[in-house]
Amino acid sequence: MGDPKKSRKKWETPGHPWIKERIGYEQELLGKYGLRNKREIWIAQSIIRKFRHQARSLLALPPAERAVREKQLVGKLLKMGLLKKETATVDDILSLTEQDLLERRLQTIVYKKGLSNTIYQARQLITHGHIAVNGKRVTSPGYIVNVDEENLIDYYVTSSFKSRPPVMSQQEGGEIGVKQA
């Protein structure tokens, strides 16, 4: 059966490491989503690849079983927030990209909700324990937020940011910086 303590890689590296277009695209994603390294992109690609593989395998099933399994997979992806409408089909699953998954990361949602000024500050607030989901501290910026948890994201109860959230301020040199309110 295997040792339960043995951890496995959750990603697959690109087949060819030096493709200029892919490197440029990955650099753009690193900046847009405030990722630490390309491994986080590869993990997102692997998760999406798994869902797309499941959707392709549905096409080979008999119609009765296919309808049941398709409904289960669409329901799971709706709950995760990767699909937007209940009438989603296998084609919608096959059109998912890693950007769809990166949009559901806690780091991205904290930034988009306005709890931080930058995507990088969102990562720092999460890793330092200032962010809670449903009242529970979450310290992983890569946490995938479900749709029902999205409105429950706030500062942690004992966080100093709860009473004084960060605000943008114009400093003397004309630079914009973070200042405690």
From Swiss-Prot:
Residue ranges of the TM segments: none
Record keyword Ribonucleoprotein present: yes
SUPFAM superfamilies, per the entry: Alpha-L RNA-binding motif (SSF55174)
MF terms in GO: rRNA binding; structural constituent of ribosome
CDD domains: S4 (cd00165)
Keywords: Ribonucleoprotein, Ribosomal protein, RNA-binding, rRNA-binding
A single GO cellular-component term on record: small ribosomal subunit
Gene Ontology biological process terms, A to Z: ribosomal small subunit biogenesis; translation
Superkingdom of this protein's organism: Archaea
Chain ranges of the S4 RNA-binding domain: 104-172
Pfam families named among the record's database cross-references: Ribosomal_S4, S4
InterPro entries per UniProt: Ribosomal_uS4, Ribosomal_uS4_arc, Ribosomal_uS4_CS, Ribosomal_uS4_euk/arc, Ribosomal_uS4_N, S4_RNA-bd, S4_RNA-bd_sf
Xref: PANTHER family: 30S 40S RIBOSOMAL PROTEIN, 40S RIBOSOMAL PROTEIN S9
Subunit field text: Part of the 30S ribosomal subunit. Contacts protein S5. The interaction surface between S4 and S5 is involved in control of translational fidelity.
Family label: Belongs to the universal ribosomal protein uS4 family.
HAMAP family assigned to the protein according to its UniProt record, in alphabetical order: Ribosomal_uS4_A (MF_01306_A)
Protein role: One of the primary rRNA binding proteins, it binds directly to 16S rRNA where it nucleates assembly of the body of the 30S subunit. With S5 and S12 plays an important role in translational accuracy.
NCBIfam families assigned: PRK04051.1, uS4_arch
Protein's name in the database: Small ribosomal subunit protein uS4
Species of the source: Saccharolobus solfataricus (strain ATCC 35092 / DSM 1617 / JCM 11322 / P2) (Sulfolobus solfataricus)
Gene designation per UniProt: rps4
